[in-house]
C-alpha cells in the first residue's frame, strides 16, 4: 500500500496479524514480488491468502485456485459491516449512468496521498469499468451529506478506525 508509512504496517494489517496470533495460528508475510517463492517454500498450502486490494489482480494470478484468497478490505467489510448489503451495493455499479452521483466515505481523516485509493484510484476504476463520466463526492470522519438518497452508490472504507456499531 503506497499510503503506508515507510517501515510500518497499516492498521488493518496489524489488526489481522493480531487476530491470527490470538487464535494460535501462523502468519507468513510476503511482498507481491516474493509471494510465489514464499508459497513454494511451504510444506503445505496456506489456509488463506490475504492481500491489499490495490494488488488483488496481480496476487490472484500467483495464488493457485485451490487456496482461498481475499483482501483486507473484504475481511473488514465482513468484520465491521454487513457483507450482504455491500454485495448488493456492488450490483449497483452495473446500473450506473452518466453523471450519476457517487459518495466515497472514509471513517477517518487521514492525509490523502497523491495516488489515494479513495480520491484517485476508485473513481478511475469506476469510470473505466462503466465507460461513463460519474460525479464523485467525498466524506470523512463520519460526517455525511444530508441527503444520502441522491447518491446512486456509496462506497465506504474498511472502517479500521471505527467500531462495528458505528458502521452499521
Describe the residue ranges of each PLM region.
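C-terminal-of-GTPase-core extension/linker across diverse P-loop GTPases
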Residues: 1-118, 125-127, 140-153, 161-168
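Short beta-strand/loop segments at the ligand-binding rim of alpha/beta enzyme cores
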Residues: 131-134
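Extended, compositionally biased non-globular segments
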Residues: 136-138
Amino acid at each position: 500500500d503506497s499510503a503506508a508509512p515507510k517501515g510500518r504496517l497499516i492498521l488493518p494489517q496489524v489488526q489481522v496479524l493480531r487476530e491470527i496470533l490470538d487464535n494460535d495460528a501462523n502468519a507468513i508475510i510476503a511482498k507481491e514480488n516474493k509471494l510465489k517463492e514464499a508459497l513454494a517454500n511451504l510444506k503445505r498450502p496456506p489456509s488463506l491468502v490475504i492481500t491489499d486490494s490495490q494488488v488483488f489482480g496481480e496476487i490472484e494470478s500467483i495464488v493457485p485456485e485451490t487456496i482461498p484468497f481475499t483482501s483486507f478490505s473484504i475481511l473488514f467489510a465482513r468484520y465491521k459491516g454487513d457483507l450482504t448489503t455491500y454485495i448488493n451495493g456492488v450490483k449497483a455499479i452495473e446500473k450506473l449512468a452518466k453523471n450519476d452521483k457517487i459518495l466515497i466515505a472514509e471513517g477517518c481523516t487521514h492525509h490523502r496521498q497523491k495516488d489515494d485509493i479513495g480520491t484517485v484510484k476508485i473513481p478511475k476504476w469506476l469510470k473505466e469499468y462503466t465507460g461513463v463520466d460519474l460525479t464523485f463526492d467525498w466524506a470523512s470522519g463520519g460526517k455525511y451529506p444530508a441527503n444520502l438518497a441522491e447518491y446512486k452508490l456509496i462506497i465506504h472504507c474498511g472502517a479500521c478506525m471505527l467500531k462495528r456499531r458505528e458502521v452499521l
